[in-house]
């Protein structure tokens, strides 16, 4: 099935709801991107909470609006905390999102992520290599880097979405968002987004937060991808390189006006 182009008008409408709700988003993410992830959510209007201790993570997941599990710096003790939080979220019907960082390259995290799939994530966000590996169609990748184009992983993403009954996001130059039956494409962004650490991980947090919104999950998640792409483009226009890109990106998210961006493109 061919992907449809995501509607920016819908993304603008969704952003208004997102800012009004300010989803409390429980981020169990990797050590490298904690600050950037929290600042990304804050800039868009969400409320991040970086609760990782096993004693606290389980009860907090039940009161949050959304949960993110990112396995980038996975350890055995952190895996236990994440599993407890996911079980709590599942019982409380809190939507949770999986970011299977480098899942095709390392066996421990691959087995951990596969085990978590039985607890029905609302969304999965990864690059092409990660989605191919999680679906069982291929292993590999270079850590957080992909060795495949996003479009090459689309059949795997669609199959995984049908298998788990969730939204799957494959990110790249064009992002693809699918529920297994319908697929949306989101072009845009800028190559500078790949020259700093954390844009993909931060997107996963925004995806997680968007899953707390009412309405169609496919459209909400695609809107989250659209916001990040638009902010990346705007930030790149005002940046001289990676160092100046990061603050410009956060400013672009804070001032994001999808309707205005739509009118100028």
Swiss-Prot record:
Database matches in Pfam families: HK (PF02110)
Pathway stated in the Swiss-Prot or TrEMBL entry: Cofactor biosynthesis; thiamine diphosphate biosynthesis; 4-methyl-5-(2-phosphoethyl)-thiazole from 5-(2-hydroxyethyl)-4-methylthiazole: step 1/1
CDD domains: THZ_kinase
Swiss-Prot/TrEMBL GO biological process terms: thiamine biosynthetic process; thiamine diphosphate biosynthetic process
Domain of life of the native organism: Bacteria
Keyword Transferase: yes
InterPro entries: Hyethyz_kinase, Ribokinase-like
Keyword presence, Heme: no
Residues binding substrate: 50, 198
EC number(s) recorded for this UniProt protein: 2.7.1.50
Cofactor(s) listed in the protein's UniProt record: Mg(2+)
Binding of ATP, residues: 125, 171
Catalytic activity: 5-(2-hydroxyethyl)-4-methylthiazole + ATP = 4-methyl-5-(2-phosphooxyethyl)-thiazole + ADP + H(+)
Keywords: ATP-binding, Kinase, Magnesium, Metal-binding, Nucleotide-binding, Thiamine biosynthesis, Transferase
Enzyme class, UniProt record, top EC level: transferase
Gene Ontology MF terms in the entry: ATP binding; hydroxyethylthiazole kinase activity; magnesium ion binding
Protein family: Belongs to the Thz kinase family.
Function: Catalyzes the phosphorylation of the hydroxyl group of 4-methyl-5-beta-hydroxyethylthiazole (THZ).
Protein name: Hydroxyethylthiazole kinase
Organism name: Salmonella agona (strain SL483)
